[in-house]
């Protein structure tokens, strides 16, 4: 614990808490100040000036990062017949129907993404209390309720991320790993930022992005200059 505290202090000394950095500077600092003993995840956290209580100001969706996330997702698909075969060919880790529902109800959760064809949602709905709180429930807005299961599986395996604004207007997302080249992290950030900017509700007033930080697992939050975006 003492060693970790020392590493944290060393990281804090390299970051000016009163300064907002450019994206390039923030990414470089995130890599430099990372002290985790593993390949830490790099994340962005936005605070948006939106009122999620209003239906037209709820932000939720999915996108594929140009350089991936550095993580291999375990994909579960609820489908039957030809669609089940398509999912298997596309590389889904688990494909099934009632058998998977029973397994999940028994406590099994060794997967990262859940995809379902529309006709399977009545069955999947039984898992709402399990999947919902973990943000694993299939949803058309994130492309996880679809007839094109092959595309959904391939995207999930190829760097697809989902995002959703919470009650306070906060949106968090993974943009890669510390082991990524800085340029690739910046590219991923810019792609995600473009998505967030395009998602701005027409009825949102004032400054849209009020705060933005980049951080690593166990790392220190580095403030990004929103005016430089």
UniProtKB/Swiss-Prot annotation:
Origin, by domain of life? Bacteria
- Gene3D superfamilies in UniProt: 3.30.190.20, 3.40.50.790
List the InterPro entries hit by this protein, alphabetically: Ribosom_uL1_bac-type, Ribosomal_uL1, Ribosomal_uL1-like, Ribosomal_uL1/biogenesis, Ribosomal_uL1_3-a/b-sand, Ribosomal_uL1_CS
Does the UniProt entry include the keyword Nucleus?
no
SUPFAM superfamilies named in the record: Ribosomal protein L1
Q: Which UniProt keywords apply?
A: Repressor, Ribonucleoprotein, Ribosomal protein, RNA-binding, rRNA-binding, Translation regulation, tRNA-binding
What is any one GO biological process for this UniProt entry? Answer: translation
Where are the annotated coiled coils located?
none
Please give the GO cellular component terms listed in this UniProt entry.
Answer: large ribosomal subunit
Q: Which GO terms describe its molecular function?
A: rRNA binding; structural constituent of ribosome; tRNA binding
What is the annotated signal peptide range for this record?
A: none
Concerning its family, UniProt says: Belongs to the universal ribosomal protein uL1 family.
Q: Function of this protein? A: Binds directly to 23S rRNA. The L1 stalk is quite mobile in the ribosome, and is involved in E site tRNA release.
| Subunit relationships | Part of the 50S ribosomal subunit.
Which HAMAP family does the annotation name?
A: Ribosomal_uL1_B
> What name does the UniProt record give this protein?
Large ribosomal subunit protein uL1
Q: Which organism is it from?
A: Streptococcus pneumoniae (strain JJA)
């Amino acid at each position: 614990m003492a060693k970790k505290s020392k590493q944290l202090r060393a990281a804090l000394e390299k970051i000016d808490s009163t300064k907002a950095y450019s994206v390039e500077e923030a990414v470089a600092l995130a890599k430099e100040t990372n002290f985790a003993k593993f390949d830490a995840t790099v994340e962005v956290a936005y605070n948006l000036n939106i009122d999620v209580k209003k239906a037209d100001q709820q932000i939720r969706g999915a996108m594929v990062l140009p350089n991936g996330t550095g993580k291999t997702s375990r994909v579960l698909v609820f489908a039957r017949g030809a669609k089940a075969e398509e999912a298997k060919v596309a590389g889904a880790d688990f494909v099934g129907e009632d058998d998977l529902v029973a397994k999940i109800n028994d406590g099994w959760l060794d997967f990262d993404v859940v995809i379902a064809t529309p006709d399977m949602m009545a069955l999947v709905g039984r898992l709402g209390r399990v999947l919902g709180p973990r943000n694993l429930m299939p949803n058309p807005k994130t492309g996880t309720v679809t007839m094109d299961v092959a595309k959904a599986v391939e995207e999930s395996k190829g760097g697809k991320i989902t995002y959703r604004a919470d009650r306070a207007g906060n949106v968090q997302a993974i943009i890669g790993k510390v082991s990524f080249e800085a340029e690739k992290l910046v590219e991923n950030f810019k792609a995600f930022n473009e998505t967030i900017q395009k998602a701005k509700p027409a009825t949102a007033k004032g400054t849209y992005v009020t705060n933005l930080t980049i951080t690593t697992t166990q790392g220190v939050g580095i403030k990004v200059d929103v005016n430089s975006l």
